[in-house]
């Protein structure tokens, strides 16, 4: 029984992409650099020529707004968010994120990728 449980947990974990691996692949495709350290000691997930991008799973969309704006200020670039939509998401977090951005006219560009 323990072997079956361990086997199940192992394959569940390898089936889920990590935020870091998604960021590395996506950021590279955009011509950006990952984990850029700011003068504040914080790390931008993906820094491109024009954008400082926070990469976050959909359920953490609220936190991504503040981080994206902070990274933009720290780098002098525009703010961006890469929202990772999880396969098991039952809530439209992208809709919620866009509602806040639009209501307050926040200068954030949103990108979406699937898990």
Where are these regions (language model features)?
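Short hydrophobic/aromatic-rich motifs at helix boundaries and adjacent loops
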Residues: 1, 39-42, 68-72
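Sec-dependent N-terminal signal peptides
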Residues: 3-13
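Acidic-basic catalytic patches of nuclease active cores, encompassing PD-(D/E)XK
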Residues: 13-49
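Short glycine/proline-enriched coil/turn segments at helix->beta-strand junctions
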Residues: 30-33, 48-51, 74-78, 106
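Short, flexible loop segments at the rims of nucleotide/cofactor-binding pockets, characterized by
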Residues: 31-33, 56-59
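Residues that form or immediately flank small-molecule/cofactor binding pockets and catalytic motifs
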Residues: 40, 113-115
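Conserved catalytic cores of phosphodiester-cleaving nucleases, focusing on short active-site segments
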Residues: 46-57, 71
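Catalytic cores of nucleic-acid endonucleases
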Residues: 58-113
């Amino acid at each position: 029984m323990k072997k079956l449980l361990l086997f199940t947990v192992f394959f569940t974990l390898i089936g889920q992409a990590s935020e870091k691996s998604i960021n590395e692949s996506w950021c590279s495709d955009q011509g950006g650099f990952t984990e850029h350290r700011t003068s504040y000691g914080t790390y931008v997930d993906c820094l491109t020529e024009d954008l400082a991008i926070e990469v976050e799973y959909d359920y953490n969309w609220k936190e991504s707004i503040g981080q994206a704006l902070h990274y933009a200020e720290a780098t002098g670039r525009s703010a961006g968010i890469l929202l990772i939509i999880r396969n098991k998401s039952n809530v439209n977090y992208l809709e919620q994120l866009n509602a806040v951005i639009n209501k307050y006219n926040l200068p954030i560009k949103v990108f979406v990728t699937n898990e």
